[in-house]
Amino acid sequence: MRHYEIVFMVHPDQSEQVPGMIERYTGAITGAEGKIHRLEDWGRRQLAYPINKLHKAHYVLLNVEAPQEVIDELETNFRFNDAVIRSMVMRTKHAVTEASPMVKAKDERRERRDDFANETADDADAGDSEE
């Protein structure tokens, strides 16, 4: 079996359907003895340029190991699903399991925000004790 990286973008009005879509697609992959190496739901993001007069889309990234028949089936599902506005399937040389730069940046922002909140709380506590 070969390794693939799959990214698909869902219409922003259909964001609530994304978990069901992910479950359906991962079920098709694992049902054919495939493996999911990485699954990231990037959420709703701004598009670089409008697609069908849309400026935002819900992004999902999958790194999988699956037979070609399953990949063909997924591409057909993407093509005929009106909620999927764009998709891309790329073959990779090996399984990618580390977090993507998108998730790493999000985690770093979250850590900085938490550190700032802790520092602010510590400063407020120190200010209360001086009075």
Curated annotation (Swiss-Prot):
Residues 98-131 are annotated as: Disordered. NCBIfam families: S6. Residues 104-116 have a biased composition (Basic and acidic residues). One of its GO terms (cellular component) is cytosolic small ribosomal subunit. It comes from Citrobacter koseri (strain ATCC BAA-895 / CDC 4225-83 / SGSC4696). Binds together with bS18 to 16S ribosomal RNA. Pfam families: Ribosomal_S6. GO terms for biological process: translation. This is Small ribosomal subunit protein bS6. InterPro entries: Ribosomal_bS6, Ribosomal_bS6_CS, Ribosomal_bS6_sf, Ribosomal_S6_plastid/chlpt, Transl_elong_EF1B/ribsomal_bS6. Keywords: Ribonucleoprotein, Ribosomal protein, RNA-binding, rRNA-binding. One of its GO terms (molecular function) is structural constituent of ribosome. Belongs to the bacterial ribosomal protein bS6 family. The gene is rpsF. Residues 120-131 have a biased composition (Acidic residues).
